[in-house]
Regions:
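Gram-positive cell-envelope targeting signals
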Residues: 1-36, 40, 160, 207
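Extracellular adhesion/carbohydrate-binding repeat motifs centered on closely spaced tryptophans
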Residues: 21-22, 26-30, 84, 96-97, ...
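Lectin-type carbohydrate-recognition ectodomains
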Residues: 28, 34, 42, 47-49, ...
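Ser/Thr/Gly/Pro-rich low-complexity, disordered linker/stalk segments of secreted
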Residues: 29-88, 452, 459-462
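Extracytoplasmic/secreted proteins, especially bacterial periplasmic and envelope-associated proteins
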Residues: 115, 159, 206, 329, ...
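A mature extracytoplasmic/lumenal domain signature
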Residues: 122, 133, 166, 213, ...
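Gly/Pro-biased beta-strand-loop elements
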Residues: 296-388, 461
Length: 462
């Protein structure tokens, strides 16, 4: 996967812009200065800025203060009091696919990227992206030209993840890097890896994305791909991950770093099974929390399902003997509705296929409340045929849009259908402060013309 290889297919995205600008890179003429930029999903307006058209290659490189650690250690980086890196001229890339992507960004103060969208152009498939912003953390993933980020000038993007699906994903890996105002240019991230900074007061000022053939390697170094406010203190190593406070003492508590979660006791990460905060967790050899322990514990006699309506996700819990349901098993992304009820219920029945009130069908339906129409179920279909998926429902998992049911991917709906007996307790609650003991899952978008759920086991290997 990371070898030198053939011609690379490039989606070159750069934010070499001035304050208050929406930038578009695509095949075709740009909008006139001062106008809005239309996409298939709506309009992004730049206020007093202007729309520019760009095609080409990578954005600027930066020169932050950087210390290379010994092998096995985490890279360290220090930031000056003022931003030192700004976007520069786009540099063409040999072998690039000209105008391979439609890119739109809104640029705020100090060249901050406040929101962005991407769309594949001339390549079959879909591209999706999730961003971490200063005033909202990790936002729901978007894709296929839908804007991700903030709508106000006080929002800026600190980090990003990118993924491709469909035919594009069969032949290419997606690599991406950017420049942060303080940290400088980051190394290349690949296929959903996190790139940028988190909680350091830094922000992206440029971005580039490259599609590389599966047999080819990365277009450059991976060094300095990501920094968090823990980067200077955490050292990740098998069986010996440590976290040292600034004063040299060992840290005790939870740490989230690079989309992984750790728990430290006196500076050393715990491994294996541990009771923490009233729950029982499993950690791997590096100390990273395992956020799906289904394969480790096997099918249980009973489960409890806790649905966070506010944040559109749920966590399945298993029983730990007399301690009750304190073992988080897995998290699932949901799409609830305004009418989804709060409270504690017991599931009364299941349906392999179910005809819905809006004349659609759904798979693996588990009723939540006896005598009422609220169900756990897959995304809806036009007919009782798994190749008639309503794609918009799949791509909007994580968004409140059902009539009150709790929508899931086919795989997750099937897991509940197969594993949770009639009478399973379901707790539906609101908590905007935390999705639960695990991270909120994200959903990579699928192409708009794909009418089957990629998680459906009926299409395994397709």
């Amino acid at each position: 996967m990371r070898k030198s290889g053939k011609r690379n297919l490039v989606l070159a995205l750069s934010a070499a812009m001035t304050m208050g600008t929406v930038m578009t890179a695509y095949a075709g003429p740009g909008a006139q200065p001062g106008s809005s930029v239309s996409t298939s999903s709506g309009v992004i307006t730049a206020g007093q800025g202007q729309t520019q058209t760009e095609s080409g290659g990578p954005g600027a490189a930066g020169s932050g203060s950087f210390t290379q650690n010994e092998p096995g250690q985490t890279q360290q980086e220090t930031s000056p009091s003022q931003p030192i890196n700004q976007p520069s001229e786009t540099v063409p890339v040999a072998g690039a696919l000209e105008n391979g992507v439609l890119l739109e960004k809104t640029i705020g103060n100090n060249n901050q990227i406040t929101n962005l969208s991407m769309k594949l152009n001339g390549v079959d498939g879909a591209i999706s992206y999730g961003v971490y912003v200063n005033n909202g953390g990790y936002l729901p993933w978007k894709g296929n030209g839908v804007a991700a980020g903030g709508t106000e000038s006080t929002t800026y993007i600190e980090a990003i993840q990118v993924a491709i699906t469909g035919e594009a994903a069969k032949h290419y890996n997606v690599y991406y890097r950017g420049t942060s105002a303080y940290a400088g240019q980051h190394g290349w991230a690949c296929n959903e890896e996190l790139m940028g900074t988190v909680d350091r007061g830094d922000y992206l000022v440029s971005l580039e994305v490259v599609l590389m053939p599966k047999e080819a390697g990365a277009p450059g170094t991976y060094e300095r791909r990501f920094f968090s406010n823990h980067s200077e203190y955490i050292r990740i190593a098998e069986g010996n991950t440590t976290y040292t406070n600034a004063d040299g003492t060992g840290y005790t508590g939870w740490v989230d770093h690079d989309r992984a979660r750790y728990y430290f006791q006196n500076g050393k990460a715990v491994t294996g099974w541990n009771y923490i905060d009233g729950m029982k967790f499993f950690f791997n050899e590096n100390g990273a929390l395992i956020m799906d322990v289904d394969a480790h514990i096997g099918k249980q006699d009973s489960y409890q399902i806790r649905v966070n309506k506010e944040l559109n996700c749920l966590t399945v819990f298993a029983k730990d003997g007399d301690n009750g349901y304190i073992v988080p098993v897995k998290a699932m992304l949901t799409s609830v509705g305004d009418d989804t009820p709060l409270g504690t219920f017991q599931t009364p029945e299941k349906h392999r296929w179910r005809f819905m009130v809006n004349e659609t069908y759904t798979q693996y339906a588990t009723r939540i409340i006896a005598g009422q129409g609220f169900l756990f179920h897959s995304i809806t279909y036009e007919t009782a045929n798994p190749e008639t998926l309503i794609t918009s429902g799949y791509n909007n998992l994580g968004v409140t849009r059902s009539l009150g049911c709790i929508r899931l991917t086919c795989a997750n709906a099937k897991w509940i259908y197969d594993n949770c007996k009639i009478g399973t307790e379901v707790v539906i609650y609101n908590d905007a402060s935390s999705p639960g003991p695990f991270f909120k899952p994200h959903q990579v978008w699928i192409p708009e013309d794909q009418t089957w759920d990629p998680t459906d086991p009926a299409f395994a290997g397709r």
